[in-house]
Amino acid sequence: MVERDNELKGTTFTISVLHISDGKPERIRQLLAAKVAQAPQFFNCAPLVINVERLTDIPDFEQLKELVESEDFVLVGITGAQSEAMKTAAKAAGLAVMASGKSRKAEPQPQPEPAPTPAPIVEVKAVPAPLVASKVHVGPVRSGQQLYAAGTSLVVLGSVSPGAEVIADDSIHIYGTLRGRAIAGAKGNPQARIYCQQLQAELLSIAGTFQLSDALPAGLIQQPVHVRLDNEQLRIDRIK
């Protein structure tokens, strides 16, 4: 039997960030509980990072950690710490101190290189990739029901009820009303899309980037829409 060495590799995850302006536990608990109530399965044991850049005083990170875990999230770290003392307190509570995703150092501009000598043109015949048929569900998806299209798209010829969940590794097409949760690009495909004839969703998610019902544009509720990722944010357009 061949033994494989342990490896340390870099990768990218989408993690929810909770921005707090004070350390009052009850307000934070109410916010997290409200989000979980909207999509309990989606947020169950979900990793969470707290942005503390608005805080002037050092919060009780041990208390915050217990509070977050009591609402079925997993607190993995903080971001936006303004002082070394705050970073030290977070580390003492077993939390990671993470840099803000928006701040990046300017990268040096590459110097132009001489144009390479053109390589000889070799004709390569394209080999078509094997097609994976979409998973088609005929009829409504009822509350508490979950459909998953592994490695392909999902087509629903009916409506998705509140409390129901439709998931696909590729795109989701709903020929009816979407009242439940739609999770496209479940394995990280940013090109996945969501289509529905009437939008009333509890949650929309593409490749880990999500939007809850309270953040949906009012003008697009009960409208036919097309959802896609645009610059790492969900963009919802009306289908004309």
From Swiss-Prot:
SUPFAM superfamilies, A to Z: Cell-division inhibitor MinC, C-terminal domain
GO biological process, one term: division septum assembly
InterPro entries listed in its UniProt record: CAP/MinC_C, MinC, MinC_C_sf, MinC_N, Septum_form_inhib_MinC_C
Keyword presence, NADP: no
Domain of life: Bacteria
UniProt keyword list: Cell cycle, Cell division, Septation
Similarity section: Belongs to the MinC family.
Assembly mode: Interacts with MinD and FtsZ.
Database matches in PANTHER family: SEPTUM SITE-DETERMINING PROTEIN MINC
HAMAP family, A to Z: MinC
UniProt function note: Cell division inhibitor that blocks the formation of polar Z ring septums. Rapidly oscillates between the poles of the cell to destabilize FtsZ filaments that have formed before they mature into polar Z rings. Prevents FtsZ polymerization.
Full protein name: Probable septum site-determining protein MinC
Organism the protein comes from: Aeromonas hydrophila subsp. hydrophila (strain ATCC 7966 / DSM 30187 / BCRC 13018 / CCUG 14551 / JCM 1027 / KCTC 2358 / NCIMB 9240 / NCTC 8049)
Lineage: Bacteria, Pseudomonadati, Pseudomonadota, Gammaproteobacteria, Aeromonadales
